[in-house]
Amino acid sequence: MPLTARAGHTLHRLPLSHYWWLLLGRHSLRHVHSYLRLRKGLRLPLPWPEQECLHLHPKPYKFLLRYPCLTRQPHLLQGWPADSSLWFDPKPYHPSADSKLLPLGLITLSAFSMRVSEPTHCSGFHAADPSLSWLTGSSPWLVLLQAPGGSLFCHDVFQGRLYLLSHSVSLFLKTGLRQCEAIYRAPLWRVRPLPSLWTCRDPDTAFLPKLLARTARRGLAAFYALWRLHLGSRSELSHPVLEWERTELVLTDRRRGWPCTHLLSGSESQRVSSSDAGDTWNAATEKAAGGKEEAERGGRQQATDRLASPHLTRGRRDCGRSLQGEEPSAAEDFARCRPLLDELCGEGGWLPFAFLTASPHVCLILTEGGPVLALDLNDTSLWRIADDLELLLRLGSLLLLSGLRLPLRPPSGSGEAARKPGYEKEEGRGRATTASATAATSPRRPTRPRGVTEKGRVTTGDVPFSAHPESEEQTDGHHGRQESGHGDQRGGDGRGHRDDGARRHANDETEPQQRGEHEDGEQTDSGREEDAQESEVARRDEKGTEQGGSGRSCGRATQTYGGRGEHGAWSSIPLSVPRPDPRVWVPPPHLLFPSPLPSITPVEDEPSARPRCPPGPAEEPSKCSPCPPCPSPDAPQSAVPRLSALSVPSPSTARVRFSLSSLSSSSSSSSSSSPSYSPSPLSPPSPVSPSSPRSPFISPIRSPGLRAKPWVSSGHPVAFPPAPSSAPPFSKRVPSVPSSASPSAPCIGRSRPPSAQTA
């Protein structure tokens, strides 16, 4: 019985009777292609909408190449199969795709109400035909595609977009083209009510955020592929406490311009926007090459004003654009933040995926490691809101208010706007606000630069670094030395002393001026003597540095850590190392990406790190109950450890490095190895995954089940040992009192027999 579509029996037949041949793709898509060659030209009704049909064709793209309206637009031909090929390449639309798709046929959506039994000939495909307005693109042409895994896709030919219809054939037989956005642009389906199988709740609002959050686990490539398919969709963030408080998100690409309420599916508009950007860049290049100094100076002045004080144009950006009819400059705002985000998250390691409907100037950014950032384009501030996208969906808008905003703006003294009379006062006020906020949240001093001296050194509150830093490693080293201690606790490589001397020598002239601002010009004799001593020490250190040959040779110039060489103030660096802009202040990465405290592995030969007390001569210790150490009369009361007081301290206190020191047994007396610890200074944060316990951010909130507390084999949490001075002396034998709190628990504070150690 031939499979034909009849008008009277279309609604009563099961879709499986028409599309059973799709199940052949489970074995090989070659079997599906063989069926298409045998049934070429057959029209099958779709599962939904039932009034539309699928025209089976083994090579539908070869048929579409007849029309010049498609061949004249090369951007629409991306991924199309070649003449001798059958497969459609989805990588231009789906970057993480690893297999090609097999075209099944063509779907022409009707522009007006027409009967399914009415034949549609190829001769009727012209602009004068009122039934199909395909030339304007209002009635899309769709190509149905199948993947080797059974997934079905739909390619919009005129818009150049690829949609994922379903992940299996059985799901396609139930939903049809419901997940294809192109069908709702057809004139027939714009005012038509939704079918009965359609859920009353918007599927994008309910299912899309969960799907995006799960896809973000696999990285930015997989997230980008799904995010591009659903541009323009809306979703909501619920509040964990106030259920009626909901924050709406719109998936859009903020790098291309201001967000629109409709679907951003038109590749023509994207091509126009990119060409406009290219024309603007070419025009600016021609102006600079032609010698138009006035236009160049005016453009530089506007750019400097926008970089220096972005808060001055907030009112005009928010409310004045709609009234004056100006074009929004969200792309310009993002172009200003792009180099800062590249330096902070790495080039290609961040993606702005959505913006808030209530606050369009706030956009959400997903980074490579999974943390979600929020960027405010009005005041150019950035803050971390969640560790991953799943946590953001669970806690909702509550996380948008947490965290400390870090301003991404250049310091004072950059550009021509610094010469304005009110600019220094405004920047000084902003600098004081930032310094007070940083000092209130962290014990360290602010590290924002205050000025550049004649010798290329940047004057800061406590940490010196070069105005043209030699490399990123040295800049991170300065931050690490500042976090590891005060002025007397520098790095162990001796580099901090040379830097300190060079800083005192370079800032010898600016120190009296800065001290005069704070002390109203009053300086005592002792202060002058200290300045003289500091200058002598600086000259001695600098002379020893130059004679000792501590500089690094790079080419013909000698580069030292003090910032001096054959070229004077400019330090010579290898050409392969890029020199960052010294005027732009970027917050250190450990402020936005704090890593948790590393897990502590238990010691193999001693499961418990607590020192034990030897038992008394007349009393044998129990084998089942734990024996906590008893207080000795000489030891203070506060130094005695208790089982209830043993807990892991918070990461904001300090880190402790453990090392085992075995006591050598001289004669027949049995001596056990007692663990000792040595507190190590805080290591400087690494640029990839830094960790700063003194970060001004709140401790990161992580979703349950991601990282559990470290546990030892005995079932008790890992605890820090007490100080060596707090342990009772081993010379005295104190009788141990067995505790009956947990009789079934294993022994705590007692070394296990050799059999248990080997097991």
UniProtKB/Swiss-Prot annotation:
Q: Where is the composition biased (Basic and acidic residues)?
A: 289-299, 417-430, 469-518, 525-545
Compositionally biased tracts (Pro residues): 585-599, 681-690
Source superkingdom: Viruses
Which residue ranges are recorded for the region named Disordered?
269-328, 406-759
- List the biased-composition ranges (Low complexity): 406-415, 431-444, 659-680, 691-704, 728-746
Name of the protein described by the UniProt record: Uncharacterized protein DR1
